[in-house]
Amino acid sequence: MAITFEAYAKNNLCYKAARTMPQGSPAGIIIHSTGCDNPYLWRYVDSPEICGKNPYGTHWNVPMPIGNGGKPTKICCHAFIGKDKSGTVRAAKILPWTICCWNCGDGSKGSYNYNPAYIQIEVCEDALNDRTYFEEAFGLAADLCKRLMKNYPTIKPENIISHKEACARGYASNHGDPEHWLARFGKNMDWFRAIVAPEKQVKLTAEITVDQSKAEEVSRKLRQLGCSVKIE
């Protein structure tokens, strides 16, 4: 089942640049939050039939969207998570996953926009006091990260980070998101990484004694379950 719906920002300069990730696939994922009290996707995503119409034209399907500073900015993420026009929490994909985005800025060592390039997801903030929305939004973000890890094995749990952590590594601008939101509900990025990490695999070894006449039948059933069988 699709986790995202596509609403590509084809008019955005970042989409038009179509700079392919230099390593061929994403090295990780950055989770952002928007810093604006508006949980509805229409604020950022140009898809009126799904998100509803943006009456102000402030979505990101323009060459340079209006940034939080109120000025046109070269900016674009890969996806937004927020509410559609019915109030359902959805994920909108606005860039192909393997195109470099323009979303985390520069740090002292470079930028995770480019090299290595990270997928970057914005979670639409509300007033930061609605636990139900918080759990739905970050639950969907976790599901999306799991799907991306499956599709791109280059993404490891330790490289699913926040904008704040990307800054601390020296590869993003000085922002604190989304830790301020996570902290409101007693969570942090270690919690998020724990829920997206693949479950640890363990090896089971067992012995079973059956009547000789039933050995082949039992062996066949065990092999169907993926077990190695040795009859002695």
Q: What is the role of each PLM region?
A:
Residues 34, 124-126, 205-209:
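Short strand-loop junctions, especially beta-strand C-caps/beta-turns
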Residues 1-114:
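N-terminal catalytic cores of peptidoglycan-degrading enzymes
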Residues 89, 155-158, 227:
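A structural micro-motif
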Residues 2-10, 17-23, 27, 116-119, ...:
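Basic/polar, cationic surfaces and motifs that engage anionic cell-wall
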Residues 200-232:
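Solvent-exposed beta-strand motifs enriched in subsets of small alpha/beta binding domains
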Residues 33-35, 83, 145-153, 226:
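Sec/Tat-exported extracytoplasmic proteins
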Residues 92-95, 161, 230-232:
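General small-molecule cofactor/ligand-binding pocket signal
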Residues 38, 86, 128, 211-213:
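Generic "edge-of-domain/loop-turn" microfeature
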